[in-house]
C-alpha cells in the first residue's frame, strides 16, 4: 500500500497544486465577502481542505473517464491509469473515499451547505464525461470549480444571495478562459481522438474568446466592487488581475503549446491578485 502511495499522489495531482489554487481563490473570495472580511478559522480550514480533497477526487475521476483517450495524448500517456500502474477501480475507490472525507468535513455546517455539497459532487463527478458531447465543457468545469462560492455563502449566511450566483458566473467565464489556454496545448491530439474542447469550438477565434472571457470576469468584479463600495486597495488588486490577463495575451497570441501552458499556470497569480484586493479592502476597514 505505502509503496503505491507515490502513484496515488500522482493520480490526484498532488505534484501539481495549481488546480487546487484555481478552486481555492474563488472560494476564499466568497468567504471574505460573505463574512465581511471576518471568516472563522474553522470555516477557512474546512473549505481549504475540502477544496483540496474534491479537486483530488475530481482528478481521479477525470483519469478514469479519460483512460481510453489519454494513451493517445503525449502529455497524458504516462498517467498512472493509462500506463497500467493503477487499475481503473482503484481510481474510482479513491475518488469515493476522498469525497466521503470531504463530506465529513462539512457535517458541522448547516443543512443548506450540505445540500449544496451534493449538487457540487454531482457536477464534479460528471464533468469529465461532458467532453464527449458538450461543445464547451470548460463552462461546465467553471460550475464545478466555482461551487465553493454558493457553499461559502451558505455556510456563513445560511442563504445564497444573488451576489453568490453572480460570482459563480464570473468564475465560469474565468474557467473558460484559463482552461481554453490549457486545451490549446492538446489541440492536435484532441482533434485526433474526438474529444470536444472550447479550443476546438472557438477555432481561429480562440484567442479572442479567451480575452473576452477575461473581460467579462473582470467586468463582473468591477460591478461587484461598485455595488459593495470597495475601496482603493480592491481596485489595485483588480488592476493587477487585469494586468495578468493582458500578459496572458502576449503568451497565447502565437498559439504555441508551452506559452499557452504557461498562461494557464499564470492564472494562479490572477486569482491571487483578485483575492488580495478583496482581503486588503476588508483588512483596511478594520483599522
From Swiss-Prot:
Keywords: Cell inner membrane, Cell membrane, Magnesium, Membrane, Transferase, Transmembrane, Transmembrane helix, Ubiquinone biosynthesis. Signal peptide: none annotated. Its main location: membrane. PROSITE patterns: UBIA. One of its GO terms (molecular function) is 4-hydroxybenzoate polyprenyltransferase activity. Gene3D superfamilies: UbiA prenyltransferase. It catalyses: all-trans-octaprenyl diphosphate + 4-hydroxybenzoate = 4-hydroxy-3-(all-trans-octaprenyl)benzoate + diphosphate. It is an enzyme of class 2 (transferase). The keyword Cell inner membrane applies. It is a multi-pass membrane protein. GO terms for biological process: ubiquinone biosynthetic process. The keyword Magnesium applies. GO terms for cellular component: plasma membrane. Its EC number is 2.5.1.39. Pathway: Cofactor biosynthesis; ubiquinone biosynthesis. Its cofactor is Mg(2+). The chain crosses the membrane at residues 41-61, 92-112, 133-153, 160-180, 197-217, 267-287. It holds the Pfam family UbiA. It is found in: Cell inner membrane. Catalyzes the prenylation of para-hydroxybenzoate (PHB) with an all-trans polyprenyl group. Mediates the second step in the final reaction sequence of ubiquinone-8 (UQ-8) biosynthesis, which is the condensation of the polyisoprenoid side chain with PHB, generating the first membrane-bound Q intermediate 3-octaprenyl-4-hydroxybenzoate. This is 4-hydroxybenzoate octaprenyltransferase. It comes from Paraburkholderia phymatum (strain DSM 17167 / CIP 108236 / LMG 21445 / STM815).
Amino acid at each position: 500500500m505505502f509503496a503505491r502511495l507515490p502513484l496515488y499522489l500522482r493520480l490526484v495531482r498532488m505534484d501539481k497544486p495549481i488546480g487546487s489554487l484555481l478552486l481555492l481563490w474563488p472560494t476564499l473570495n466568497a468567504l471574505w465577502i460573505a463574512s465581511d472580511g471576518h471568516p472563522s478559522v474553522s470555516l477557512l480550514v474546512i473549505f481549504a481542505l475540502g477544496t483540496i480533497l474534491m479537486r483530488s477526487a475530481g482528478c481521479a475521476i477525470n483519469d478514469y473517464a479519460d483512460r481510453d483517450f489519454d494513451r493517445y495524448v503525449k502529455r497524458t500517456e504516462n498517467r498512472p491509469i493509462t500506463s497500467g500502474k493503477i487499475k481503473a477501480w482503484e481510481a474510482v475507490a479513491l475518488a469515493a473515499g476522498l469525497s466521503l472525507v470531504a463530506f465529513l468535513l462539512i457535517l458541522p455546517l448547516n443543512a443548506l451547505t450540505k445540500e449544496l455539497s451534493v449538487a457540487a459532487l454531482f457536477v464534479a463527478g460528471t464533468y469529465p464525461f461532458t467532453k464527449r458531447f458538450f461543445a464547451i465543457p470548460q463552462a461546465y468545469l467553471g460550475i464545478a470549480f466555482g461551487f465553493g462560492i454558493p457553499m461559502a455563502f451558505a455556510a456563513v449566511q445560511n442563504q445564497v444571495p444573488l451576489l453568490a450566483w453572480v460570482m459563480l458566473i464570473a468564475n465560469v467565464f474565468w474557467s473558460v478562459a484559463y482552461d481554453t489556454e490549457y486545451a490549446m496545448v492538446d489541440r492536435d491530439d484532441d482533434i485526433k481522438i474526438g474529444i470536444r474542447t472550447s479550443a476546438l469550438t472557438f477555432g481561429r477565434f480562440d484567442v479572442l474568446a479567451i480575452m473576452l472571457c477575461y473581460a467579462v470576469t473582470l467586468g463582473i468584479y468591477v460591478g461587484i466592487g461598485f455595488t459593495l463600495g470597495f475601496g482603493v486597495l480592491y481596485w489595485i488588486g483588480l488592476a493587477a488581475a487585469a494586468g495578468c490577463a493582458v500578459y496572458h495575451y502576449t503568451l497565447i497570441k502565437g498559439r504555441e503549446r508551452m506559452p499557452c501552458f504557461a498562461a494557464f499556470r499564470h492564472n494562479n497569480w490572477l486569482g491571487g491578485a483578485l483575492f488580495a484586493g478583496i482581503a486588503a479592502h476588508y483588512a483596511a476597514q478594520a483599522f
